[in-house]
């Protein structure tokens, strides 16, 4: 990295646009691109692979009076086109975020949504400066559109009612930013952008407020990031893989954003791979053909070199195991081993902590894998294996080895189930969860675990002897023995058929026999609850000798069952069962304080 800050060596700041699905990220990028193309003459935009480069002259044309181009020596802005399904967290560079600055798009009517919260978390974690684009101002009831105008000029044309409704929504968003720990205000009221987040009201459809957004982005980049934009224009290129794609005639290619130095055709490069760094040689550097030539048979044209900052498609052998989000390094005049170690070191920063038992995690890129691992750690969900890529048969085989049923699960973020893994999954005892929102994915898994644990507890509850205390009613002896049949009232707990029963003599439990039948109003039943009166048949005792009318009897609880009831199922049993259990344990523990512990 050089210390130069002359215009020749200042690169274009990299801008990422992120936000909740349907809040208008794509429309905003399309509007910025479209307006830039329509301004045309002043130095039309360059469409890169995975990015759009808008030069300062074009921004100046679009922003009109808001910008004086002589105030700037940065060359323009490079907007990264992160498709809706791509998490911003994919964009890493040297341990931080690839983007120098971000635009968080929020629907002015909806405010913060799940993916907004997720984006805010990532921005906070990576320390990326950002502005908020409060989109869809044109949907405010009674709005009078002023196409392409700066927002304050547009506001002058609105009725008091429309402006007041918009302000209400804007201050709702400013409040939500405050709740997330960020001080924010409408951008023209912000005195210090290092301490406060600027909110830019705009419409991606009418273009209102878009000049303001470009002005704020240029101003922030020029003021606070100029030194970081200084690059060694001839140095070995450094970049980040956006996506790995198969292209006809080229095989596996990597869409890459170059953020430092220069990449040339024929360069030897090192790329982060799924198993180990890939050392290969560039066969072709590809850029999209200009828009007017897009209908030609060839989508791409070859270029000799690409300097930072730019998006480019790199074609080279052995790239099929390259990872989205991984580093790309040009070797040039250095030992290749040194560059391999550099890439390994960067990948090591993203190593996910795994446990001997846990779930399998798959994500589309290294950055999102890292974000998933962080979120799972916070949720205290252990990870057995974490990898980039779609879900393959071996992932299912690994998930099946988990010791606990709840860990026999795969959590996939922005990934697909490969065709050859579908049959495996159908035949395996493995649960698959996929989603495009990390927090939703984890919430679905946690709900599944809770339901599974509840079902297991219910199964245990079905097998365990339930506590009960009941009294033989006076004048309710229907048969004295073989079996004794008496009427009883259940005082607390649940009387179950086929259980041993008895009474306490001092602190000793005396078993008198086993229940062999329960009848309620003449019908056979399996159990009787607190407050019910039923007749029961007891094999073993004789009424008048072993038991008497008025006696209180208890269900005999095996010690192992008492321990499970007290330690694992206390919340699952009813209040009166807890009462019967507590009284039973209290009496048993007078003789042996450690009974059932």
From Swiss-Prot:
Region G4: start-end pairs: 135-138
Region (G3) location: 81-84
Positions of the UniProt region annotated as G5: 203-205
Gene3D superfamilies in UniProt: P-loop containing nucleotide triphosphate hydrolases, Translation factors, Translation initiation factor IF- 2, domain 3
UniProt KW keywords: GTP-binding, Initiation factor, Nucleotide-binding, Protein biosynthesis
Family: Belongs to the TRAFAC class translation factor GTPase superfamily. Classic translation factor GTPase family. IF-2 subfamily.
Protein name: Probable translation initiation factor IF-2
Species: Halorubrum lacusprofundi (strain ATCC 49239 / DSM 5036 / JCM 8891 / ACAM 34)
């Amino acid at each position: 990295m050089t210390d130069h800050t002359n215009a020749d060596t200042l690169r274009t700041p990299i801008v990422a646009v992120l936000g909740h699905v349907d809040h208008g990220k794509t429309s905003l990028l399309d509007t910025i691109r479209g307006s830039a193309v329509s301004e045309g003459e002043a130095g039309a935009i360059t469409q890169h692979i995975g990015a759009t480069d808008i030069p300062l002259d074009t921004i100046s044309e679009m922003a009109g009076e808001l910008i004086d181009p002589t105030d700037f020596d940065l060359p323009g802005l490079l907007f990264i086109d992160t498709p809706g399904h791509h998490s911003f967290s994919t964009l890493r560079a040297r341990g931080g975020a690839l983007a120098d600055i971000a635009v968080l798009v929020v629907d002015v009517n909806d405010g913060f949504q799940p993916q907004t919260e997720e984006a805010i978390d990532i921005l906070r974690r990576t320390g990326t400066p950002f502005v908020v684009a409060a989109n869809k101002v044109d949907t405010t009831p009674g709005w009078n559109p002023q196409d392409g105008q700066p927002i304050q000029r547009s506001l002058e044309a609105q009725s008091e009612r429309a402006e007041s409704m918009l302000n209400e929504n804007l201050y709702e968003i400013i409040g939500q930013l405050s709740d997330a720990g960020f001080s924010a205000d409408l951008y023209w009221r912000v005195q210090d952008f290092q301490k406060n987040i600027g909110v830019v009201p705009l419409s991606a459809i009418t273009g209102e407020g878009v000049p303001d957004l470009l002005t704020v982005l240029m101003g922030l980049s020029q003021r606070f990031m100029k030194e970081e934009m200084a690059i060694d224009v001839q140095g070995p290129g450094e970049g980040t893989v956006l996506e790995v794609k198969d292209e006809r005639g080229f095989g596996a290619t990597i869409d890459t954003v170059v953020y430092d130095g220069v990449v040339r055709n024929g360069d030897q490069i090192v790329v982060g791979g799924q198993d180990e760094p890939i050392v290969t040689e560039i066969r072709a550097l590809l850029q999209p053909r200009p828009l007017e030539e897009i209908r030609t048979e060839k989508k791409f044209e070859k270029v000799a070199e690409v300097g930072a900052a730019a998006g480019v498609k790199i074609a080279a052998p052995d790239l099929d195991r390259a990872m989205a989000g991984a580093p790309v390094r040009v070797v040039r005049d250095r030992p290749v081993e040194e560059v391999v170690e550099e890439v390994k070191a960067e990948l090591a920063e993203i190593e996910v902590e795994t446990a001997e038992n846990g779930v399998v995690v798959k994500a589309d890129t290294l950055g999102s894998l890292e974000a998933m691992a962080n979120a799972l750690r916070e949720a205290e969900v252990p990870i057995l294996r974490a990898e980039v890529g779609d879900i393959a048969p071996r992932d299912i085989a690994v998930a099946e080895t988990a010791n606990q049923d709840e860990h026999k699960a795969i959590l996939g973020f922005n990934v697909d189930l490969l065709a050859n893994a579908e049959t495996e999954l159908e035949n395996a005892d493995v649960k698959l969860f996929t989603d495009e929102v990390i927090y939703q994915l984890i919430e679905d898994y946690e709900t599944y675990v809770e339901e599974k644990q509840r079902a297991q507890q219910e199964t245990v509850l079905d097998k365990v002897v339930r506590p009960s205390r009941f009294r033989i009613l006076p004048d309710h002896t229907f048969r004295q023995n073989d079996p004794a049949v008496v009427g009883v009232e259940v005082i607390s707990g649940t009387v179950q058929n086929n259980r041993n029963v008895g009474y306490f003599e001092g602190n000793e439990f005396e078993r008198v026999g086993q229940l062999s039948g329960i009848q309620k109003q003449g019908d056979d039943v399996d159990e009787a609850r607190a407050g019910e009166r039923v007749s029961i048949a007891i094999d073993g005792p004789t009424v008048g000798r072993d038991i008497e009318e008025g006696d209180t009897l208890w269900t005999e609880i095996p010690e192992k069952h008492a321990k499970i009831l007290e330690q694992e199922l206390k919340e699952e049993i009813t209040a009166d069962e807890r009462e019967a259990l507590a009284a039973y344990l209290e009496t048993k523990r007078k003789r042996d304080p450690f009974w059932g512990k």
